[in-house]
Amino acid sequence: ADYGYNISMGDHCFCNYGCVLLDVCPIRIGDMTQIGPYVQILTADHPRDAATRDQGREFGQPVEIGRNVWIGGGAILLPGVTVGDDAVIGAGAVVTKPVAAGMTVAGNPARPLVPRASSH
């Protein structure tokens, strides 16, 4: 973790080796979530406009991950995304938009594949 004090992990979570949690804003991870190796969860961002970026401005957006989420190795979650409960993020996916509960996403940018069957 870069800072560490903005990270909140639920009960029975697992975070594999080599992960980066850049927490300039809050990162919230729900219970029973599993995070594969080399996953990056990023909250630091910068303006897209070159003139504003030249002024040195930066900002952050929080990332929220629900409960019982599985994040495959090497996935990248960009600032401001939310991931719903029981979702699956495929290995190497780049998550740029919200992921609905129960959804499986993969690719760059991450796109929906199929909803997972509920185990409840």
Regions found by a protein language model. Give the residues of each.
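Flexible, glycine/small-residue-enriched loop-and-beta-strand segment within the central core
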Residues: 1-82, 103, 108-120
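C-terminal/domain-terminus segments
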Residues: 83-98, 104
